Swiss-Prot record:
Cellular component aspect of the GO annotation: cytoplasm
Originating species: Escherichia coli O9:H4 (strain HS)
Segments passing through the bilayer: none
Record keywords, A-Z: Amino-acid biosynthesis, Arginine biosynthesis, ATP-binding, Cytoplasm, Ligase, Nucleotide-binding
Gene name per UniProt: argG
UniProt keyword annotation of Nucleotide-binding present: yes
Protein name in UniProt: Argininosuccinate synthase
Binding positions (L-citrulline): 99, 135, 139, 192, 201, 203, 280
InterPro entries per record: Arg_succ_synth_type2_subfam (IPR023437), Arginosuc_syn_C (IPR048268), Arginosuc_syn_N (IPR048267), Arginosuc_synth (IPR001518), Arginosuc_synth_CS (IPR018223), Arginosuc_synth_type_1_subfam (IPR023434), AS_cat/multimer_dom_body (IPR024074), AS_multimer_C_tail (IPR024073)
Amino acid sequence: MTTILKHLPVGQRIGIAFSGGLDTSAALLWMRQKGAVPYAYTANLGQPDEEDYDAIPRRAMEYGAENARLIDCRKQLVAEGIAAIQCGAFHNTTGGLTYFNTTPLGRAVTGTMLVAAMKEDGVNIWGDGSTYKGNDIERFYRYGLLTNAELQIYKPWLDTDFIDELGGRHEMSEFMIACGFDYKMSVEKAYSTDSNMLGATHEAKDLEYLHSSVKIVNPIMGVKFWDESVKIPAEEVTVRFEQGHPVALNGKTFSDDVEMMLEANRIGGRHGLGMSDQIENRIIEAKSRGIYEAPGMALLHIAYERLLTGIHNEDTIEQYHAHGRQLGRLLYQGRWFDSQALMLRDSLQRWVASQITGEVTLELRRGNDYSILNTVSENLTYKPERLTMEKGDSVFSPDDRIGQLTMRNLDITDTREKLFGYAKTGLLSSSAASGVPQVENLENKGQ
């Protein structure tokens, strides 16, 4: 069976991921007029720029949908976001600033929950607004087929008939008006924005050019911290984790993770925390550029990693970072539910996150400028008395350290012999001016 349909399957049910924007509105109306039976599915991901979710399915019905459903994905989205924090599943960083994979997390939830809803309605053909150059077309493809093995894919934006008739936003707007819908195009921005309650992505258009900076972006989850006229007073915030799970902010305990994330967004957003400018590698190996917001994710991530470094040993922390980067890349590629990702998630949540219990107090200032004021945990292996510089009882003596250093002579001797071997073969210069250790020929020392 052909998985991807190049032309409209007339007379068949087609599920469309319906945002209510111009593109999906025109596509739904066009499919109905051409003889398909469209079903509209809208994901409530807690998008910060969406004012009225309930109105979206109503508009879909007006445009010809056979049925329209609003699927609440917020609880699952936050659960996956917390899992990503527990695992450090982030692989794109620039200058210490992290992209929190908020769009890939949203696609993992949308791609599974919407297709599951379609399957309930007997809809086995799915369309969405992703383009052939981006990451989402592959993410949705993978998650859709994982959820429904019988799924077929139809995308109007890959159908030459649709493109010939309605190839641009102006043509789509004229089409809607001609069909009796007073649909006016929204004012064109200098970039495109996609968001969910974990974060926002700003990309394309002017932002494709690296001389266009973050300063052209109007944040939807934070503030213009780079604008000196924007007053941002410093603020102390306390974050508490229990067994790797964020449970309290500023002493207020949350039983609802969605409400906790919304409050974390409000706190971090007041300062512009978690905003970053990234050049990344798309799934197809081409580079793209995005400016990201994720105030709540950033706040939780900072507190989580502070506890992590005080609780776990060096090798565990190293594995957390290495496996987290690997898992972040799998998430980015649309493989969040693949076996290799599940294996990494299980080990990180079981052996790392389970011990993260405690409280971190931060002072937030402008943007990503913050200070850690206090760290408290019953699981801390950081114990200042072990290494205090003050006189008193110690867990080891000067003689103990002399013995430990003496044992280092073995590997120091081995390393020195290797350096001499490298110099002998020309890989290293024996001159101290080269910036490498000066290698002395011990064999000829007595001559």
